[in-house]
Each structure stands twice: as C-alpha cells, then as structure tokens.
C-alpha cells in the first residue's frame, strides 16, 4: 500500500514505490522539465533518483513524494521536503517538479503550500527553504507564493556544471 502523506483539494502526496518508475521516468527524462538540472536524466540517473527518495523515506520519514491528481489517480510530479546542504548545515528544503503538461495550473503552489504546513506543524521545523536555479523563474514564483523570500545566492556544482541558485526561506 502506498502511504498517503498529504491531501489537498486536488492532489494527494504519497510515498513513491518502484511501481512509479514509468511515471517518474517520463517526467525526469523530459528536457523541458529538467532544464534546471542541465538536461534530462538517463535511465540510470532516474533509477538512482528513485532509490534516493526511497532511502530518504527510511532515513527521515519524508522526502520527495509523488504528486497524484485525485480526479484521475495520475502521478503528475513530485513535491516534498528533503534535507539539503546550505552553507555548513543540512536544511529542510521544499522541492517540486511537475510534468510539463501540468505547469501553470497551480498544482506546484498547492503542493508546496501543503508541504510548508506539514514541515512546520508535523515535522516541527522552524524554517523551510527552497534552493532554486537562478534561471528557473517559474519555481521562484512558486516559492514567493509559498510565503518565502530570497535570502542568499549560492553556486552549486552539479553534473559537472557550476549552477547559480537563489536561496528562499520562510520562518514559522
């Protein structure tokens, strides 16, 4: 049974299982979706991404969850909370990634807001972050609508590329 973590008006956020690999692959292997990661993932990278989420569920009790449309039961993306390195600490980050055809419909904001409430009320974090590539304006707008403000500018080295990022934060 797939554990449902959060429910909103239109969405369920639930732990993923290996049976979600098909839906996850179609998202992570889409160049349009993955432009902030410097390109689509290979099959190997997609499987490693899934394994990382499954391990996060075991280690922390949270991670990136599958975003499911209640009306159709379709997995349309991922949203959740992960621990990410920022400066010299691990901080809780709200992350989101949706299939291209579901962009600009309010789903990312709806899921991110639910994660913010979960992070504060259930996980008892005092601060939540979103670390977003500087070119990813749509995700920056989601962070702002989620009550976050930009607090820093960092460079992350990922896939052999230096990628500037903006750090957003909201306090409880």
What residue ranges belong to the model's regions?
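Acyl-donor (CoA/ACP) binding surface of acyl/acetyltransferases
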Residues: 1-34, 68-172
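A short helix-loop-beta-strand connector motif used in the catalytic cores of GNAT acetyltransferases and
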Residues: 53-66
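Conserved GNAT-fold acetyl-CoA-binding loop/helix
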Residues: 32-52
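Short, conserved alpha-helical segments within structured domains
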Residues: 41-45, 63, 90, 135
């Amino acid at each position: 049974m797939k554990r449902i973590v959060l429910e909103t008006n239109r969405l369920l956020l639930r732990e993923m299982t290996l049976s979600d690999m098909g839906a996850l692959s179609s998202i992570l292997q889409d160049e349009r979706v993955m432009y902030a990661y410097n390109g689509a993932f290979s099959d190997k990278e997609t499987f490693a991404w899934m394994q990382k989420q499954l391990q996060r569920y075991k280690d922390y009790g949270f991670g990136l969850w599958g975003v499911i449309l209640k009306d159709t039961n379709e997995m349309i993306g991922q949203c959740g909370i992960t621990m990410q390195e920022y400066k010299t600490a691990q901080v809780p980050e709200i992350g989101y990634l949706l299939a291209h055809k579901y962009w600009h419909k309010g789903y990312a904001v709806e899921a991110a807001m639910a994660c913010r409430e979960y992070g504060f009320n259930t996980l008892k974090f005092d601060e939540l972050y979103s670390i977003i590539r500087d070119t990813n304006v749509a995700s920056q707008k989601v962070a702002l609508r989620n009550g976050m403000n930009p607090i820093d500018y960092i460079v992350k080295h990922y896939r052999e590329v230096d990628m500037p990022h903006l750090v957003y934060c909201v306090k409880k």
